[in-house]
Amino acid sequence: MAVIAVYSVKGGVGKTTIAANLAWFSAAISKRRTLLWDLDAAGGAGFLYGIEPSKRARAGSVFSRDVDPAELIHKTEYDRLDLLPADESLRDLDGMLARIGKKRRLERMTQALAKRYERIVLDCPPVLNEISAQVVRAADLVIVPLPPSPLSTRAFALVAEEIRRHSPAHPPILPVFSMIDRRRALHREAQDANPNWPMIPLASAVEQCAVRQQPVGVFAPASAAAKGFQQLWTAIERKLAEAG
């Protein structure tokens, strides 16, 4: 089993869309039993799969009251793909983790799910606190979406530095350009400066994920966006294989 965290300290970089689509590629293309776990109280991952948050707001209970995560898992309409949705109870997750004082709570829970899933994709909130520290401890690979700009390399270095600060024995980190538009000179310059970074294009198909509440591979499998997610997923599987 491998845990893949999609994490950024900055919002609005396509993090949730990337996490939701990677989970689908894991289940549909790699044929792996996959869990998409939404840790962001905004609940975007659930929305992208048409799953509404529970009115009972229990997502935080798996951390605070030792509720089995399996009790809150929803099946999606896609084979091998399940979702553990977020809700407003996660808004105080940082304080909750600080109060219970269990530094590896998330790691232990993902390990407990290893019998059911081969891949767990975490959609993480854009924060630098105990949540991000627990994510780094639990993850086998951290995906960092970045906007294409001349400062992308510096931005990635800062995120990587923070990850190392929280966990010296940190997992591999894979940067990915999100919302890249090759028609823009600055975007081309950023990509040319980092040609080995995977990229997700700025495309209407990506925007349609929220409208259709479906992964792009379902309704636009031949699109540039679907190819971008496929290439990113291939890079992820390669990184995991290299890490052993």
What are these regions (language model features)?
Residues 1-244:
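P-loop NTP-binding core
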